[in-house]
Amino acid sequence: MFAFKKAQRLLKKNDFDFVFESAKKITTEDFIFLFRENKLGYARLGLALSKKMIAKAHDRNRIKRLLRESFRHTNLPAVDIIILARPGLAKKTNLGINTKLNKTWEKLTSCYGK
């Protein structure tokens, strides 16, 4: 059974600041991925989906669930990742979001040669 463990999350301000201070960036139509290599040996995820970009709470929650689920099932290198939403994301279907995420995970993995 796969679980999204607490250790796989970016929870503290210091964790987010670590990524923001010298992050690499992948930009898609729907998301901005900021990532930076860590020394932990596993990937961690932080989400920043603002009310300004996704107005309805149920849409934000749906998208967070999709992001966490996709992250859980993807074998990623040891990086800290912050995902920022872009306008119009709430109108996308789950299938469309998952397709874009899979392409982006592949791109991110290729940056680290895993």
From Swiss-Prot:
It comes from the Bacteria. Its EC number is 3.1.26.5. RNaseP catalyzes the removal of the 5'-leader sequence from pre-tRNA to produce the mature 5'-terminus. It can also cleave other RNA substrates such as 4.5S RNA. The protein component plays an auxiliary but essential role in vivo by binding to the 5'-leader sequence and broadening the substrate specificity of the ribozyme. This is Ribonuclease P protein component. It comes from Legionella pneumophila (strain Lens). GO terms for biological process: tRNA 5'-leader removal. GO terms for cellular component: ribonuclease P complex. PANTHER family: RIBONUCLEASE P PROTEIN COMPONENT (PTHR33992:SF1). Pfam families: Ribonuclease_P. The keyword 4Fe-4S does not apply. Keywords: Endonuclease, Hydrolase, Nuclease, RNA-binding, tRNA processing. Disulfide bonds: none annotated. Belongs to the RnpA family. Consists of a catalytic RNA component (M1 or rnpB) and a protein subunit. It catalyses: Endonucleolytic cleavage of RNA, removing 5'-extranucleotides from tRNA precursor. GO terms for molecular function: 3'-tRNA processing endoribonuclease activity; ribonuclease P activity; tRNA binding. It is an enzyme of class 3 (hydrolase).
